[in-house]
């Protein structure tokens, strides 16, 4: 097994240019592929997840050119849904941002498709999306377990109409349906069942659809109306914002052991909800400064928080490890959807925090964390989850070193993460 041991970091200071956002990169690639015209996408994230989307688009006949460093992609739009004569199997790894949106998009055209992925992908639910697509006229079959990939899609277009979708597990299901809805034959009304999680991710989807020429009427995140029979219109250039979830590690590091860290590529006008992570650090006691395209954080005396983190589930993971450096007991509430991510993150986080000496209570949808007087050295298991590896790297900010098992899992969103962290660290 591969592992790296991070030696104790004395001080953090510097500037980080963020890689492109995973959420925006894969949405932009798919919409550009469905659009009429050619779109140049800049600051694209180079990662496993985008690679899976690009491979799928190539198999679907989409033409694109990639720059040498794979951060710029010129996509020749298909001018509407995909039509294929031969049955196609698409392997999507563990990329939820490829699996869910493609599942919806492929129902719009014609052809037979099998969507599959890594073993963990087969444990990640997709039933709420499939139920909604079936209501809109899609023919989708589960090939192994009911409610989970792999799936077989026999595409013949979506009729539209009134569709209900459960919003309580993952916002990606609604994102997938929204992105496909304009190309249904008729108008679509989407009614949300249950409380919609991760609303800021829906804002990302609506923002990108609007840039490609499609308006959605949003009634308080309870009901959405989309006109059918539309085609997305290509953009000359679409610039992908920096990844706000990835920013969280560097900002937290500054709050714990700064100095000041400035991250560029996101700022006060960012469309990503995860920029609110900086507000949480400020609440804990760090000093935060905002610009249009940067956020900077400086060290402060950190105190525990008790908060609902439903709006920023990915960045909230970073708060769980930051809590080890705060005074008091931190409570993260309303984070059930951690359980259906790359791994069961609630359970994984509780297990690994206990290894370093924290007192942890793991509830169905919450976590309480009381830091120990002194952290213990531990070998942290990452569960093939990029965010586990990056969150626990913050433990190097303690005088005790930390070992991260299988650190290469950061390739999912941030292949150069450990090099970038080192570049702003003094030992």
Swiss-Prot record:
PROSITE patterns the record matches: EPSP_SYNTHASE_1, EPSP_SYNTHASE_2
Family matches, as HAMAP family: EPSP_synth
Enzyme active site: 314 (proton acceptor)
Source organism superkingdom: Bacteria
Binding site for phosphoenolpyruvate: 22, 96, 124, 172, 345, 387, 412
Annotated InterPro entries: Enolpyruvate_Tfrase_dom, Enolpyruvate_Tfrase_sf, EPSP_synthase, EPSP_synthase_CS, RNA3'P_cycl/enolpyr_Trfase_a/b
SUPFAM superfamilies membership: EPT/RTPC-like
Biological role: Catalyzes the transfer of the enolpyruvyl moiety of phosphoenolpyruvate (PEP) to the 5-hydroxyl of shikimate-3-phosphate (S3P) to produce enolpyruvyl shikimate-3-phosphate and inorganic phosphate.
Major subcellular site: cytoplasm
Enzyme class (EC, first level): transferase
Name listed for the protein in its UniProt record: 3-phosphoshikimate 1-carboxyvinyltransferase
Keyword Transferase appears in the UniProt entry: yes
Known EC number: 2.5.1.19
One Gene Ontology term of the molecular function aspect: 3-phosphoshikimate 1-carboxyvinyltransferase activity
Assembly mode: Monomer.
Keywords tagged on the record: Amino-acid biosynthesis, Aromatic amino acid biosynthesis, Cytoplasm, Transferase
GO cellular component, one term: cytoplasm
Pathway involvement of the protein, from the record: Metabolic intermediate biosynthesis; chorismate biosynthesis; chorismate from D-erythrose 4-phosphate and phosphoenolpyruvate: step 6/7
Catalytic activity annotation: 3-phosphoshikimate + phosphoenolpyruvate = 5-O-(1-carboxyvinyl)-3-phosphoshikimate + phosphate
Family: Belongs to the EPSP synthase family.
Places the protein is found: Cytoplasm
């Amino acid at each position: 097994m591969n592992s790296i041991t991070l030696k104790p970091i004395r001080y953090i200071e510097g500037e980080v240019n963020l890689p492109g956002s995973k959420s925006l990169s894969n949405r932009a690639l798919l919409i550009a592929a469905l659009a009429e015209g050619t779109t140049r996408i800049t600051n694209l994230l180079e990662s496993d997840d985008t690679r899976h989307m690009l491979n799928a688009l190539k198999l679907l006949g989409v033409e694109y050119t990639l720059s040498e460093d794979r951060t710029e992609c010129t996509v020749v739009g298909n001018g509407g849904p995909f039509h294929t004569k031969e049955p196609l199997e698409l392997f999507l790894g563990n990329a939820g941002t490829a699996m869910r949106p493609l599942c919806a998009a492929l129902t719009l055209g014609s052809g037979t498709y099998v969507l599959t992925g890594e073993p963990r992908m087969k444990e990640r639910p997709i039933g709420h999306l499939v139920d909604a697509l079936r209501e809109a006229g899609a023919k989708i079959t589960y090939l192994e377990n009911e409610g989970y990939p792999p799936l077989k899609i026999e595409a013949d277009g979506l009729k539209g109409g009134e569709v209900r979708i459960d919003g309580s597990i993952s916002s990606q299901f609604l994102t997938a349906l929204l992105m496909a809805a304009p190309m249904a034959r008729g108008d679509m009304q989407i009614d949300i069942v249950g409380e919609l999680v991760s609303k800021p991710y829906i804002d990302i989807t609506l923002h990108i659809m609007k840039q490609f020429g499609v308006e959605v009427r949003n009634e308080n995140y309870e009901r959405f109306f989309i006109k059918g029979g539309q085609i997305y219109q290509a953009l000359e250039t679409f610039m992908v914002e920096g990844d706000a979830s990835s920013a969280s590690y560097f900002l937290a590091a500054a709050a714990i052991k700064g100095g000041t860290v400035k991250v560029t590529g996101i700022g006060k006008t960012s469309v990503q909800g995860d920029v609110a992570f900086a507000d949480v650090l400020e609440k804990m006691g760090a000093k935060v400064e905002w610009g249009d395209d940067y956020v900077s954080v400086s060290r402060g005396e950190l105190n525990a928080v008790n908060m609902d983190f439903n709006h920023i589930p990915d960045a909230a993971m970073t708060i769980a490890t930051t809590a080890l450096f705060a005074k008091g007991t931190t409570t993260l509430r309303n984070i059930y959807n951690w359980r259906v991510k790359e791994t069961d993150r609630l359970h994984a986080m509780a297990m690994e925090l206990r290894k370093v000496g924290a007192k942890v209570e793991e509830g169905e949808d919450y976590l309480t964390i009381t830091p120990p007087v002194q952290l213990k050295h531990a070998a942290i298991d990452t569960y093939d989850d990029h965010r586990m590896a990056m969150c626990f790297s913050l433990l190097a900010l303690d005088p005790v070193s930390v070992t991260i098992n299988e650190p290469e899992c950061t390739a999912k969103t941030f292949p150069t993460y450990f090099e970038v962290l080192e570049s702003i660290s003094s030992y």
